């Protein structure tokens, strides 16, 4: 008997629009995410949730995992697509489907599970940051696999909102000087990160320049954000390992 192994299938819920730079350089954020978290032989489907595109409810079970991207919108907002996204996440929670929440996605899952989100207490955070990883966490040891769990990890941050109170069912996995909740998990199916494991230096710098040109940021703040990456880089390889092992483990 010939057994044909089913392709693993994942969905990206894109909660932001592609900038002209990202379209020109990468062909869109979808490609940024797939190149970061995807592997050969997998199927990745794009749903522009910001435009109201969602999978049919009956198709949710076909997916092995989901990724919710960052967004310029507030996760505590009441736009139709945000409310719909929360409803879909509630279904995924009930189904125990794996969901990786990034930035806005991290906050959406907090909202869905009864935590509190709002404006960042210490103000917007943009640039490379070192976050402190929780010690002796068995789940993290599993996700890092053959690599020892590091004491800290560098990640690119770009947010003005944050998790103010964790859901009761959540386990805190990382924090920093500027943000109390940098990473958490719920059960084995929700894994959430405030930073952007998919970002690189050029993506960050383009966002900084664009926001600066829109007069939504002071020059001093922009310079400070860029200066964080003068001599350091994010731990992209370790973040990839962590996220892939969660999604596919």
Swiss-Prot record:
Its EC number is 3.4.19.16. It comes from the Eukaryota. Pathway: Secondary metabolite biosynthesis. It is found in: Cytoplasm, Cytosol. Keywords: Cytoplasm, Hydrolase, Protease. InterPro entries: ChyE-like, Class_I_gatase-like, GATASE. Pfam families: GATase. It catalyses: an S-[(1E)-1-(hydroxyimino)-omega-(methylsulfanyl)alkyl]-L-glutathione + H2O = an S-[(1E)-1-(hydroxyimino)-omega-(methylsulfanyl)alkyl]-L-cysteinylglycine + L-glutamate; (E)-1-(glutathione-S-yl)-2-(1H-indol-3-yl)acetohydroximate + H2O = (E)-1-(glycyl-L-cystein-S-yl)-2-(1H-indol-3-yl)acetohydroximate + L-glutamate; 2-(glutathion-S-yl)-2-(1H-indol-3-yl)acetonitrile + H2O = 2-(glycyl-L-cystein-S-yl)-2-(1H-indol-3-yl)acetonitrile + L-glutamate; (Z)-1-(glutathione-S-yl)-2-phenylacetohydroximate + H2O = (Z)-1-(glycyl-L-cystein-S-yl)-2-phenylacetohydroximate + L-glutamate. GO terms for biological process: glucosinolate metabolic process; proteolysis. One of its GO terms (molecular function) is peptidase activity. It is an enzyme of class 3 (hydrolase). GO terms for cellular component: cytosol. Residues 19-217 form the Glutamine amidotransferase type-1 domain. The active site is at 103 (nucleophile), 196, 198. Involved in glucosinolate biosynthesis. Hydrolyzes the gamma-glutamyl peptide bond of several glutathione (GSH) conjugates to produce Cys-Gly conjugates related to glucosinolates. The gamma-Glu-Cys-Gly-GSH conjugates are the sulfur-donating molecule in glucosinolate biosynthesis. Can use the GSH conjugate of the camalexin intermediate IAN (GS-IAN) as substrate. Required for the biosynthesis of camalexin, a pathogen-inducible phytoalexin with antibacterial and antifungal properties. PANTHER family: GAMMA-GLUTAMYL PEPTIDASE 3, GLUTAMINE AMIDOTRANSFERASE YLR126C-RELATED. Belongs to the peptidase C26 family. This is Gamma-glutamyl peptidase 3. It comes from Arabidopsis thaliana (Mouse-ear cress). The gene is GGP3.
